Amino acid sequence: MPAAQAGVMPGSWAGKPAVLAAVLVALAVESTAVASLGTPLLPTIETVDHVSLAASQWALTIALLTGAVATPVLGRLGDGRLRRQAVLGTVATMLAGCVLCAIPAGFAVFLTGRALQGAGFGLVPLATAVARHNLPAERRGHTIMVIGVTTAAGIGIGYPLVGLLAQGLGLYAPFWFAAALSALALAAAMAVLPSSPARPARVDAGGAVLLGLGITGLLLVLAEGPGWGWASAITVGSAIASVALLAGWVAWELRARSPLIELRLLCRRPVVAANVTAFLVAVGFYPLAPLVVRFVQTPAAAGYGFGATVLIAGLMLTPFSLASFAASTVVRRSARHLSAEVVVVIGCVALIASMVLFLVARDAYWQIVTAMALDGFGVGCVYAVNPLQITGSVPAGETGSAMSFYQLARTVAYSIASALSATLLVLSIPPGHHLPANAGYSTAALISTAILIAALAASLLFALPVTNPAVRRTTGPAHD
């Protein structure tokens, strides 16, 4: 049966894979944009809700936390008969989160809304599973590639509009707009998404609980470590408990009949390469956007910064998204000449160049724009091919699960990067001041550069030809 006919599209859209592909990409863009909506608004959140820099960072961290917990469960649901319901339920949850954030009811309600929005991170493995199961071969690979890129590009797509709305109508206007977009996305998904396969996808409840508790503990340590003290009993105890829970989860999954994530499939070389490079790249590149947003909005009286508006800060991130999509086009056209591993190497080089530029030259807008464009191109290269490495190495029935682990690795990496950059900025605030020192930005950029160099080293290692027959047997294509 052709891929496009594996499910039945409701209504008049049946048999139109181009429409399905467009909706899947739109869902990925919308989910990522909404989940990262707080980034350009952090300084505004601090002012409106009268919270500290560390507290405002929770507008990002809590979305990442709920995304990390929800993604593996949604990924497993995406491999069975509840795939369509999982997509619709996730979009509806995001819609509810947008409405809560749009209500001026205090910081606690705002954070609750952001937590619900974080479920949107789980849409990426769901959309990938739908694409692999329901699109024809000639459209499937390109759609999966674009979905992979939008998970990064979506971070900057809506920033200028968010800045314009916040500047003209206040903090809550962008969330009303996001609620409207979520409602449109829900309507489109209801009209276009195909029916799910008949076979059930059993959710490993025990594995979900162990993984959820372990990830939650780990992310809490990363978020609260600076306030608790990295050597404090609660930080060390929470870290040990999180590691123990995650170790228990691995042991549980290896014995489970229907594991939440089939860990043995993750040992295949292309899958390992995708997850390792995606994790390191995410830790390395993710700090740049919040650093740039805060840097350009800092008053020039502080000795650095441009005193820019929220709108201008959002515009600084637009080159990131444009370059990400441009990279996906370049990757698609060069697919016959360059392997996925080589593309990842090229992406890592561009990422290192972007961070080095921000480290040594950030005195003019054009330097910021150039750094963000290089950052976007590098991310676009890496995240265009990572999903193809995974989907080409696992059975179709494990697509959602395998992609959920990939998304989970990136979400944890984003949390590490967010906590790291926030900690470095807080530590750089001089006594008696409320703004970070310029040196704090340099330190964050320097550490990010070192992490990206590690990502480059890993990508070069995976780009080497395989000579061990035992390893070569784990690199072949998956058989559905």
Region annotations inferred by a language model:
Residues Q167-A278, A282-G284, A289, M316, ...:
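Hydrophobic transmembrane-helix bundles of small-molecule transporters
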Residues G106-R114, W366-A371:
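Short hydrophobic/alpha-helical segments at membrane-entry points of transmembrane helices
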Residues V48-H50, L82, I103-V109, L169-G170, ...:
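Helix-breaking motifs and short loop linkers at transmembrane-helix boundaries and internal kinks
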Residues L116-V149:
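Cytoplasmic helix-loop-helix junction between adjacent transmembrane helices
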Residues M1-K16, F462-D480:
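Intrinsic disorder in cytosolic terminal tails and internal cytosolic loops
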Residues P17-P43, L53, Q57-A63, V73, ...:
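12-transmembrane solute porter fold
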Residues G78-L82, L135-E138, G168-G170, V203, ...:
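Membrane-helix interface residues
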Residues A68-A105:
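Conserved MFS/SLC helix-loop-helix module at the cytosolic interface between two early adjacent transmembrane helices
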